[in-house]
Amino acid sequence: MARQGTIHRVTGETDVKVRLDLDGSGQCQASTGVPFLDHMLHQISSHGLIDLEINAVGDTHIDDHHTNEDVGIAVGQALAQALGDRRGIHRFGHFVAPLDEALVQVALDCSGRPHLSYSLAIPSQRIGTYDTELVKEFFVAVVNNSGLTLHIRQLDGVNSHHIVEACFKAFARALRMATEVDPRRAGAIPSSKGVLEQAGAS
């Protein structure tokens, strides 16, 4: 069964289209109007071996906030759609990614229970034109719409670009670990309860 998600989200502020394939080869086409966000989406795709197609048009003449958040929402929704009932996956993932002096640890659980614990200390307010406050907002949006429990810890680093890129790389590798199919599960849901909550379920 294909583990894919397709989302088209339209608001008064943005128009976002996302296609995601968890069993891809790391192919990425990202055009959000926010260059640094595009760069980070490529990290998720390349290091998570997730095929991503993302196109967004937003009110970036105001700032990047709405586009950044709505791309995160759509990515989270596409991820939840691709995972379905999470049957047969490893469920948990973790990775520590270095990038020169920066070191960031990510641990996650495809639990269906949204939670973000975030402790990046990014020194500069901007990387290029990108407001570094938006890093957390992106992950808040992903978590709330995918049902991930996500912990992000900065262990070292002084260069803002290195810290953020290490974070996205660690997230990608942890996500790959968690979402890969575990052959020993034989298609069973990875929970002692026999069920995992699905994002968006009432």
UniProtKB/Swiss-Prot annotation:
This is Imidazoleglycerol-phosphate dehydratase. It catalyses: D-erythro-1-(imidazol-4-yl)glycerol 3-phosphate = 3-(imidazol-4-yl)-2-oxopropyl phosphate + H2O. The keyword Cytoplasm applies. GO terms for molecular function: imidazoleglycerol-phosphate dehydratase activity. It is found in: Cytoplasm. Coiled coil: none annotated. It is an enzyme of class 4 (lyase). InterPro entries: IGPD_sf, ImidazoleglycerolP_deHydtase, ImidazoleglycerP_deHydtase_CS, Ribosomal_Su5_D2-typ_SF. Keywords: Amino-acid biosynthesis, Cytoplasm, Histidine biosynthesis, Lyase. Disulfide bonds: none annotated. It comes from the Bacteria. GO terms for biological process: L-histidine biosynthetic process. Belongs to the imidazoleglycerol-phosphate dehydratase family. Its EC number is 4.2.1.19. GO terms for cellular component: cytoplasm. The keyword Nucleotide-binding does not apply. Pathway: Amino-acid biosynthesis; L-histidine biosynthesis; L-histidine from 5-phospho-alpha-D-ribose 1-diphosphate: step 6/9. HAMAP family: HisB.
